[in-house]
């Protein structure tokens, strides 16, 4: 098979990678990868870095040694500067107001093109009496489904699917329902004789519960100490393992001792936090393009400078995210 080489973008090693760039990231003024790299560095770094640093960053990005997160690439040179890929949200109070607020925060974040993760553990279980308004609580799972449907309708730029993560503590009274909440093959569609899972095999876009959402169970210090004491992981964990082996979900979120409150995750779960409205700030170093340890160190240093500039330049969806970014300033 002849080796692929593009005249416009010679740094790409396959037509597939160039097609992704053209479909997702190329836009006016950034029609080629090197043009995007130059525009992006000038847009993000402005006067915060020296000309030499910016020139070297442009070369590193052009050569695919350092690749900023996808939102950096998408918003390079655009009027809005939503450079952050994801946001970490927390249901903070078991109240009607917080229930509504988490929807507003989720939609505000998703409309920038960033993904979200939400810990719903504070919400009361299904069926508990509501003293203030009367009736019975619906529990956290319907709220997860509401956020899932917001994500279904928020297609940033008309082409980007929302990325969503949801978690629940292992002691929550609704955890058994949560564990089975994506068992689509156990969910019949009326009298058709088919399950949601069977139909979704044929039509990827067929609507299914939490189909836009990755889910995980949170395990805390109490769970760990009980395991150390008794050697028993407990029914919830065993069911979680069976589910994960069967369908890959739910996953596992382990938060112990001084990190016990860091239950928040972004949609891809590489960032952890205990602070509501936290934000991730992503870039990747492509070691396959780097020749030696010295070059690796140089790339890391300039990539760090670039991402720090991003924390000064990036626009955010609402005020609390600015405050949390100022506190944590994550890279």
Put a short name on every predicted segment.
Residues 1-331:
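Extended catalytic cores of very large enzyme megasubunits
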């Amino acid at each position: 098979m002849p080796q692929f080489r593009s005249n416009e973008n010679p740094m790409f090693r396959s037509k597939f990678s160039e097609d992704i760039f053209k479909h997702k990231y190329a836009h006016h003024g950034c029609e080629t990868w090197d043009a995007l790299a130059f525009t992006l560095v000038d847009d993000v770094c402005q006067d915060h870095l020296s000309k030499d640093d910016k020139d070297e960053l442009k070369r590193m990005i052009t050569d695919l040694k350092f690749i900023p997160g996808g939102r950096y690439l998408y918003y390079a040179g655009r009027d809005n500067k939503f450079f952050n890929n994801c946001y970490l949200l927390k249901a903070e109070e078991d109240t009607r107001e917080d229930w509504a607020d988490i929807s507003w925060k989720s939609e505000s974040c998703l409309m920038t093109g960033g993904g979200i993760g939400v810990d719903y553990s504070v919400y009361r279980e299904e069926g508990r009496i509501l003293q203030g308004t009367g009736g019975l609580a619906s529990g956290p799972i319907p709220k997860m489904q509401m956020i899932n449907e917001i994500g279904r309708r928020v297609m940033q730029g008309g082409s980007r699917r929302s990325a969503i993560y949801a978690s629940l503590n292992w002691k929550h009274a609704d955890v058994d329902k949560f564990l089975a909440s994506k068992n689509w093959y156990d969910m019949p569609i009326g009298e058709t004789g088919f399950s949601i899972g069977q139909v979704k095999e044929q039509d990827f876009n067929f609507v299914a519960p939490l189909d836009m959402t990755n889910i995980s169970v949170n395990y805390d210090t109490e769970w760990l100490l009980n395991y150390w004491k008794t050697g028993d992981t407990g029914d919830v964990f065993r069911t979680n393992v069976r589910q994960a082996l069967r369908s890959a979900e739910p996953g596992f979120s382990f938060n112990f001792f001084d990190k016990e409150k860091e239950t928040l995750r972004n949609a891809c779960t590489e960032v952890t936090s205990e602070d509501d409205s936290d934000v991730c700030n992503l870039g990747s170093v492509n070691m396959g393009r780097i020749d030696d340890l010295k070059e690796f160190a140089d790339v890391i240093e300039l990539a760090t400078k670039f991402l720090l500039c991003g924390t000064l330049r990036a626009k955010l969806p609402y005020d609390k995210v600015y405050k949390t970014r100022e506190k944590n300033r994550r890279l």
